[in-house]
């Protein structure tokens, strides 16, 4: 599956990206107003909040992140918690467990545990959907900035010798 990267100018998702992401997602899984959704690594929860509104969810979706952003979306239940800790003690079941652009941040053994625990928390016909960056076709916007700063620093050091 392929989906265009965010707006490629900022780390935050643009409205057009959020809309295209949700449309793409809804082609992968049938969800409705009764669906239960968990987002592992939700960030500010903008995508999850938008999806909640689009589906008119009866229950707020749950978003997990290890950073508690001040400007997080109010349409979700946000939990500042490590995914493994949440999955180990959670008893709720989900129709969709979403892992967007975060799977690479976990250790291999933790990825296996996250997937195993997630599978046990799915409702019948539920899905785990993992999105990750294609490193060849998508460059994180900050990489080019970091590269320029590193080159500038290197050039300054060269001048001092």
Mark where each language-model region is.
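A short glycine-rich, Lys/Arg-flanked "PGG" loop and its adjoining helix->strand segment in the class I
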Residues: 112-124
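A conserved beta-strand element that flanks and buttresses the S-adenosyl-L-methionine
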Residues: 98
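Short catalytic micro-motifs in class I SAM-dependent methyltransferases
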Residues: 101-102
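Class I (Rossmann-like) S-adenosyl-L-methionine-dependent methyltransferase catalytic domain
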Residues: 1-29, 44-76, 80-88, 129-161
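Conserved class I S-adenosyl-L-methionine
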Residues: 35-43
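Local beta-strand N-terminus motif with an aromatic residue
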Residues: 34, 94-95
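Short glycine-centered segments of the SAM/dcSAM-binding site in methyltransferase folds
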Residues: 36, 126-127
């Amino acid at each position: 599956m392929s989906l265009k990267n965010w707006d490629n100018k900022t780390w935050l998702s643009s409205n057009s990206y959020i809309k295209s992401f949700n449309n793409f997602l809804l082609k992968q899984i049938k969800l409705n107003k009764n669906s239960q959704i968990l987002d592992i690594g939700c960030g500010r929860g903008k995508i999850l909040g938008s999806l909640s509104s689009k589906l008119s969810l009866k229950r707020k979706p749950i978003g997990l992140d290890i950073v508690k952003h001040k400007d997080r979306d109010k349409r979700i239940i946000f939990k500042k918690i490590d995914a493994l800790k949440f999955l180990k003690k959670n008893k709720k079941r989900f129709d969709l467990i979403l892992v967007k652009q975060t799977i690479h941040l976990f250790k291999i053994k933790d990825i296996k545990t996250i997937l195993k625990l997630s599978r046990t928390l799915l409702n019948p016909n539920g899905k785990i959907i993992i999105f990750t960056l294609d490193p060849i076709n998508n460059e994180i916007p900050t990489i080019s900035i970091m590269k320029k700063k590193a080159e500038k620093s290197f050039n300054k050091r060269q001048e001092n010798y």
